[in-house]
Amino acid sequence: MKTLNVELIVTPKTPKKIRKGVKLLLSALKITDAKPVYLSFTHRSDTYLNSFCFKNCEDEKKKTGCEIIYGWSLWEDKKLGFYEAEFHSVIKDNGDLIDITPRRKNEDSILFVADMSKTSGRKSVNSWYSWSNCKIVNGHVAEVSVELEIVQADGELSEFHTAHAIAGKK
């Protein structure tokens, strides 16, 4: 028997509706008490970089005293039956959730759900504790989220391109 390896190009976008795939993500993440909300980007500083949500929120908290909220950006490629939850942080200012991290893909908004059971935090000068992405393909969990360390390799490039994950515990 021969094995056929197929590589699909997935182009996830912000879900327009909360469909079954998004609900499956929430279930896989064990989120039962929070509802996803759409958040637009709010510019707070020219120094905030795309994909550096942890650092951006940390810097904003130092400047304004706001609260950092951890959770998940939810993505879908509906045509391929692909759904993904990406660990993300936003701020809470005057009771409102605000996404201050510029977008990689210029999305108008993201679908965000808070997850009070997961946290992040600085481990060293250039690394944070975080969680890997959770992925669902055709209604089945393809990757579960695990705790990891994000290492900032270069301040000019996004975490997406410069980070590496090291499975481990705090």
Where are these regions (language model features)?
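A structural boundary/capping signal
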Residues: M1-K170
